[in-house]
């Protein structure tokens, strides 16, 4: 009799995705982040669901409902901090996952890559709206500043902002709709993840060499299931260490002050994972220009397949491109640092130079270096 996992309609899907899936024999730990992102999404949905049971999306009670969760609900504090720090873990895994894709040329699977970009935008939108919900000072002013950027859109900008706010300022209507969107988006993300995997399994995974590995495949289970399990263990250990020892390490102390529309915090800044984009936004003196640069800082990923000029897929055997890649990583760290600094000399000029370098590296230097490396192959 044939094994049920190969015949049952539902089991068959799971089998082809997790058990009998042919996987390259040489994929490194950099390929672990896909499954880790799945784990992060699962943690966020479960902890978020339990938080939603006790949270109230009203301007008068939102802040105190979060306090109530931490003080009065059984293990509410750990659920709340796992959710808050889980978001940081999510973004760490996301950035490493995207970085892996750039380094090893995974973006040549254009459908998988483009859905990945959509996922990145969706996760960023979800995280932004989630940050507004505790209704602290940084929640309120972050929401005000970021939504107000849409007013830079010509002609319809102001109307659009007021439509999103549900009034003439960030208020009760805004908080309620942000809660609704924050609740529904993770499920849309989960659906997009399925599409992301569907397209990935059409082609199979890339590998560090960037060479087609059809002749050398191994079953996903037990090799990569055990490898993923180790990754899960490490991620959960790291998350719990953060939650139990320094839960507020990555947060902003201003968010422990209830939202006050009459008192602006001295430095309005988003969570750490948005600081690089925030630095790019602030580096352009023009409002519309800044908004365009902000969107392009992520959307630029979509043009990577078009800018791939190398004869090799991966950067594994391309030292010049490798150097530029690591300069790009250092540049992103610089932007993240600048995003958290006040708008004053010398931070302004550093931010402008780092923003210029970011686009210059991706659009000009990296494609040019690939062409040079193609020439070097003939030596």
UniProtKB/Swiss-Prot annotation:
Its cofactor is heme b. Pfam families: Cytochrom_B_C, Cytochrome_B. It is found in: Mitochondrion inner membrane. PROSITE patterns: CYTB_CTER, CYTB_NTER. Binds 2 heme b groups non-covalently. GO terms for biological process: mitochondrial electron transport, ubiquinol to cytochrome c. Gene3D superfamilies: Cytochrome Bc1 Complex, Chain C. It comes from the Eukaryota. GO terms for cellular component: mitochondrial inner membrane; respiratory chain complex III. Keywords: Electron transport, Heme, Iron, Membrane, Metal-binding, Mitochondrion, Mitochondrion inner membrane, Respiratory chain, Transmembrane, Transmembrane helix, Transport, Ubiquinone. One of its GO terms (molecular function) is metal ion binding. The cytochrome bc1 complex contains 11 subunits: 3 respiratory subunits (MT-CYB, CYC1 and UQCRFS1), 2 core proteins (UQCRC1 and UQCRC2) and 6 low-molecular weight proteins (UQCRH/QCR6, UQCRB/QCR7, UQCRQ/QCR8, UQCR10/QCR9, UQCR11/QCR10 and a cleavage product of UQCRFS1). This cytochrome bc1 complex then forms a dimer. Belongs to the cytochrome b family. Component of the ubiquinol-cytochrome c reductase complex (complex III or cytochrome b-c1 complex) that is part of the mitochondrial respiratory chain. The b-c1 complex mediates electron transfer from ubiquinol to cytochrome c. Contributes to the generation of a proton gradient across the mitochondrial membrane that is then used for ATP synthesis. Heme 1 (or BL or b562) is low-potential and absorbs at about 562 nm, and heme 2 (or BH or b566) is high-potential and absorbs at about 566 nm. This is Cytochrome b. It comes from Ochotona ladacensis (Ladak pika).
